[in-house]
C-alpha cells in the first residue's frame, strides 16, 4: 500500500495559550502589531432574563457583543501557516506540504456588531460561526494515517 502524504500538517507550537477570540464585522487593512487597549474601552455587561450583552467602544464607535460558547469537546485554534513554498526542490507535479502550527486555542467566540443583538437568521456573522460548527461536526480526520 502506498503511503499517503498529507497536504496539510498540524503541529503543536510548544504550549498553546487559551485566548479570547473576537469576530469583528469589518475590514481592517493594517496587519501589524496594534496597541488594542488604547482604543478598546468601557466594557459594560448588561444582563436580563434572556440575554447577556457586552457593550464597548472601539475608537469612538459603540459595539455590542454576544459571547458564543463552542460545543462540548470542541476547541477553536488559531494557527500560523508555513506554506513550504520556499523549497525549490519540489517538482511542478508535486504538491508542497503546508505546516500549520497551533498558536493559541479558544473555547468561546465574542461576536461584535454595531447594531443591537440580532437573530441568527439576520446576522450573517453569527450564522457563519454556527454553520462552521455544524460543518466541523461532519468532518472526520484519521491522524493514525500520518504517524
Swiss-Prot record:
> Which terms in the GO cellular component ontology are assigned?
cytosol; nucleus; ribonuclease H2 complex
Question: A Pfam family this protein belongs to?
Answer: RNase_H2_suC
Show the InterPro entries listed in the entry. RNase_H2_suC (IPR013924)
Any Gene Ontology biological process:
removal of RNA primer involved in mitotic DNA replication
Q: What PANTHER family does the annotation carry?
A: OS02G0168900 PROTEIN, RIBONUCLEASE H2 SUBUNIT C
Q: What is this protein called?
A: Uncharacterized protein C12B10.15c
Q: Which species does the entry assign this protein to? A: Schizosaccharomyces pombe (strain 972 / ATCC 24843)
What taxonomic classification does the UniProt entry list for its organism? Eukaryota, Fungi, Dikarya, Ascomycota, Taphrinomycotina
